[in-house]
Curated annotation (Swiss-Prot):
This protein's name: Large ribosomal subunit protein uL16
Sequence similarity: Belongs to the universal ribosomal protein uL16 family.
Cystine pairings recorded for this chain: none
InterPro entries registered for this protein in UniProt: Ribosomal_uL16, Ribosomal_uL16_bact-type, Ribosomal_uL16_CS, Ribosomal_uL16_dom, Ribosomal_uL16_sf
Alphabetical UniProt keywords: Ribonucleoprotein, Ribosomal protein, RNA-binding, rRNA-binding, tRNA-binding
Record-level Gene Ontology MF annotations: rRNA binding; structural constituent of ribosome; tRNA binding
Keyword tRNA processing in annotation: no
Organism: Chlorobium phaeobacteroides (strain DSM 266 / SMG 266 / 2430)
Length: 139
């Protein structure tokens, strides 16, 4: 599971997901990418499930890049706890994803294989996504 080795602050505020992604919006490493079309918190478990789905379909051919990292802790109070008495303890980690963000990239496989691999990965994610190809791709 992806998570930071250490953080400056154990707990963070929830924040808001306004607007589109400012960076990470172009395919930089591979030839194919999976782009987010909606804002969401993507958990480290969802990222891992998508990664496993892609690598299994691609039969470990090619290369996959994960372009998002879960660096935001989400807290949760224990079950049957009364309100008040402070914030809960960190339970899991999420990556804040805004529309336009490239979440995964792949290379070294045919276009049809990449399309299907990203389709399987998208089923593991809680948002609408789009398969995109690098503009200068020759295939």
């Amino acid at each position: 599971m992806l998570m930071p080795k250490r953080v400056k602050y154990r707990k963070t505020m929830r924040g808001r997901m306004k607007g589109n992604s400012g960076r990470g919006t172009s395919v930089d490493f591979g030839s194919f990418g999976l782009k987010a079309l909606e804002p969401a918190w993507i958990t480290s478990r969802q990222i891992e499930a998508a990664r496993v789905a892609m690598t299994r379909f691609m039969k470990r051919d090619g290369k996959i890049w994960i372009r998002i990292f879960p660096d935001k802790p989400v807290t949760k109070k224990a079950a049957e706890t009364r309100m008040g008495s402070g914030k809960g303890s960190p339970e899991f980690w999420v990556a804040v994803v805004k529309p336009g963000r490239i979440m995964f990239e792949a290379d070294g496989v045919p276009r049809e294989v990449a399309t299907e691999a990203f389709r399987l990965a998208a089923q593991k994610l809680p948002i609408k996504t789009k398969f995109i190809v690098r503009p200068d791709y020759e295939g």
